[in-house]
UniProtKB/Swiss-Prot annotation:
Region annotation LID: where it falls in the sequence: 127-164
Pfam families cross-referenced by the UniProt entry: ADK, ADK_lid
Primary location: mitochondrion
Gene for this chain: AK3
Protein residues bound to AMP: S38, R43, K64, G91, R94, Q98
InterPro entries: Adenyl_kin_sub (IPR006259), Adenylat/UMP-CMP_kin (IPR000850), Adenylat_kinase_CS (IPR033690), Adenylate_kinase_lid-dom (IPR007862), ADK_active_lid_dom_sf (IPR036193), AK3/Ak4_mitochondrial (IPR028586), P-loop_NTPase (IPR027417)
Function: Mitochondrial adenylate kinase with a specific GTP:AMP phosphotransferase activity. Could also use ITP as phosphate donor. Its physiological function is to recycle GTP into GDP which is necessary for the TCA cycle in the mitochondrial matrix.
Gene Ontology MF terms: adenylate kinase activity; ATP binding; GTP binding; nucleoside triphosphate adenylate kinase activity
Compartments where located: Mitochondrion matrix
Species of provenance: Bos taurus
Keywords: Acetylation, GTP-binding, Kinase, Mitochondrion, Nucleotide-binding, Phosphoprotein, Transferase
Protein name per the record: GTP:AMP phosphotransferase AK3, mitochondrial
Domain notes: Consists of three domains, a large central CORE domain and two small peripheral domains, NMPbind and LID, which undergo movements during catalysis. The LID domain closes over the site of phosphoryl transfer upon GTP binding. Assembling and dissambling the active center during each catalytic cycle provides an effective means to prevent GTP hydrolysis.
Gene3D superfamilies: P-loop containing nucleotide triphosphate hydrolases
EC number: 2.7.4.10
Length: 227
């Protein structure tokens, strides 16, 4: 299989809008590893009505955060199926208790931290507007409507999702920072934190790629389909 004999245990961290999803999918495309998104895992369990999915849904329905022990159970249960693979966790651990619980089960080798200035993220996230009737999405920077605030086809007004409003974005970013700073510090002290800073995903990616080349076998061209 190449690289080292020991399998890689890694996690990726980054604020909402940091490009974490894009970087994760590129990592999965280029390297031999399993990508485990805690958000996808949660949705899948809720959809299938598993015991832990039902439990998690009760918190979500009440507008509460899912407790650390529930998220930890969810992820550790899934990781049992991935013991023979290199893996990359995405969206977990999000808090210090989650990181400590993960540590008791697995030795984490690398934590990739995408450090994108909050101002850049705020611009990215608040640039999105939608046409409620059709679900058409516009981005003020990349594909703006012909007339500001108006849907191209119907002439109806565009709206901004609650999540994309500047005040909501700022609140989410501050909450992320408060929650994850202790986690980053925890991994920094362990000497496994690798921070990649920048304002554009396409400029950050080559550095992440070069770093992972030293840690992981690459997919051969014939098998480079996403697992």
């Amino acid at each position: 299989m190449g690289a080292s004999a020991r399998l890689l245990r890694a996690a990726i961290m980054g604020a909402p809008g940091s490009g974490k999803g894009t970087v994760s999918s590129r990592i999965t495309k280029h390297f031999e590893l399993k990508h485990l998104s805690s958000g996808d895992l949660l949705r899948d369990n809720m959809l299938r009505g598993t015991e832990i999915g039902v439990l998690a849904k009760t918190f979500i329905d009440q507008g509460k955060l899912i407790p650390d022990d529930v998220m930890t159970r969810l992820v550790l249960h899934e990781l049992k199926n991935l013991t023979q693979y290199n893996w990359l966790l995405d969206g977990f651990p999000r808090t210090l208790p989650q990181a400590e619980a993960l540590d008791r089960a697995y030795q984490i080798d690398t934590v990739i931290n995408l450090n994108v200035p909050f101002e850049v993220i705020k611009q990215r996230l608040t640039a999105r507007w939608i046409h409620p009737g059709s679900g058409r999405v516009y981005n003020i920077e990349f594909n703006p409507p012909k007339t500001m605030g108006i849907d191209d086809l119907t002439g109806e007004p565009l709206v901004q999702r609650e999540d994309d409003r500047p005040e909501t974005v700022v609140k989410r970013l501050k909450a992320y920072e408060a929650q994850t700073e202790p986690v980053l510090e925890y991994y920094r002290k362990k000497g496994v934190l690798e921070t990649f800073s920048g304002t554009e995903t396409n400029k950050i990616w080559p550095h992440v790629y070069a770093f992972l080349q030293t840690k992981l076998p690459q997919r051969s061209q014939e098998t480079s389909v996403t697992p």
